Amino acid sequence: MILQAGTPETSLLRVLFLGLSTLAAFSRAQMELHVPPGLNKLEAVEGEEVVLPAWYTMAREESWSHPREVPILIWFLEQEGKEPNQVLSYINGVMTNKPGTALVHSISSRNVSLRLGALQEGDSGTYRCSVNVQNDEGKSIGHSIKSIELKVLVPPAPPSCSLQGVPYVGTNVTLNCKSPRSKPTAQYQWERLAPSSQVFFGPALDAVRGSLKLTNLSIAMSGVYVCKAQNRVGFAKCNVTLDVMTGSKAAVVAGAVVGTFVGLVLIAGLVLLYQRRSKTLEELANDIKEDAIAPRTLPWTKGSDTISKNGTLSSVTSARALRPPKAAPPRPGTFTPTPSVSSQALSSPRLPRVDEPPPQAVSLTPGGVSSSALSRMGAVPVMVPAQSQAGSLV
């Protein structure tokens, strides 16, 4: 909301502003907080300690000869993007402080300097000191605030050195060096140790990235190379050994690498093959097997029947149709009828019965193999209708 000039609200705000300005001027006149010139911006090294100097004075010393001066002190840290963080306080004679922080002197000396120990990078920021002095009646007679900016520096952490490329004669390689932590950012320098000492500069050296490029390698360039990461507060080193090889050595190394890779692949393949085979055997062992149904044994023909050469009864003719039956010799005084065409269709007269031993039926194939042997060999019997003596199918 914008207030126009001459309104009652504007007059009230003006009165309040003038009153606060007068009170602040009176407070500054009663006491003043001091920070040494040139020490409002400090730098310190991580792990060490630092003192933030500050003290206050009263304007009218003669009116404060009695010991009832009650200061209220607060130190707090302000960092970008964070809420103010209280570091130390002294209120009503009780001091509260975080670990590693303390007052350098007794507060009765009016010296409110703050000591910070075991510094970390996270301790960087703006420290504000607020002092409010009261009398024995609890009335404020002076108040002041001062700021000191602190920057914690970090020496380079031990860097890591590496070699990029295959170092054999005539090729190019790059030596890399990198520190994981440094404030401010580290600068890098490469050198080769004795007996062939050498310090490298640009353009082969990149002091910001920490890389050193070596071109057209030779045997004489072999040796120990040292990288030094350095900033304003410290340094750290690492080294790498360069062994330049001839073509034969390079071929041996390449062959060893390839052979190792091929060997690993073969071992992996054998392991997979063994696992697959074991799994297959396990599955076969776990299968439920059913007994095969025995083949049906069909009756075979008599030994007088003929069988085809392929072992099946595809064409069987009755031996009775092929050969006439054996008749008994005629007795004297008996009549032997002669069969005719018409008598074959009618029932023939009963022939005289001759007592002879019945022929033994032996089922043999033309090759001399029995029916049981054919059944074991897997032959399949085929039923073929037989012919009667009259030539009709039975």
Swiss-Prot record:
- Can you tell me which residues are glycosylated? N111, N172, N216, N239
* Range of residues in the leader sequence: 1-29
Organism domain of life: Eukaryota
Tell me which residues bear Phosphoserine.
S304, S340, S343, S348, S375
Which GO annotations describe the biological process of this protein? bicellular tight junction assembly; calcium-independent cell-cell adhesion via plasma membrane cell-adhesion molecules; cell-cell adhesion; homophilic cell adhesion via plasma membrane adhesion molecules; protein localization; regulation of actin filament polymerization
Pfam name, any one: Ig_3
As for subcellular location, the record says:
Cell junction, Adherens junction; Cell junction, Tight junction; Cell membrane
Q: How is it placed in the membrane, per its record?
A: Single-pass type I membrane protein
Give GO terms: molecular function aspect only. cell-cell adhesion mediator activity
Question: Could you list which ranges are Extracellular topological domains?
Answer: 30-251
Q: Does the keyword Phosphoprotein apply?
A: yes
Q: Which cysteines are joined by disulfide bonds?
A: C177-C227
* Domain Ig-like V-type per the UniProt entry, residue ranges: 37-146
- Segments carrying the region annotation (Disordered) are 304-372
Q: Which residues lie on this side of the membrane: Cytoplasmic?
A: 273-394
Q: Does the keyword Disulfide bond apply?
A: yes
- Alphabetical UniProt keywords: Cell adhesion, Cell junction, Cell membrane, Disulfide bond, Glycoprotein, Immunoglobulin domain, Membrane, Phosphoprotein, Repeat, Signal, Tight junction, Transmembrane, Transmembrane helix
Tissue-wise, where is it found?
Highly expressed in the heart and lung. Weakly expressed in the kidney and skin. Expression is restricted to the vascular endothelial cells. Expressed in the kidney, heart and tongue (at protein level). Also expressed on megakaryocytes and activated platelets.
Which factors induce or repress this protein, as stated in its UniProt record?
Up-regulated on the surface of platelets upon activation.
Phosphothreonine-modified residues are T336, T338
Transmembrane segment boundaries = 252-272
> Can you give the residue ranges of the Ig-like C2-type domain?
159-243
For bias type Polar residues, the affected ranges are 304-318, 335-347
Quaternary structure and interacting proteins, as annotated: Interacts with MAGI1.
According to its UniProt entry, what is the function of this protein?
A: Can mediate aggregation most likely through a homophilic molecular interaction.
Name the UniProt record assigns to this protein: Endothelial cell-selective adhesion molecule
The UniProt gene name for this protein comes to Esam
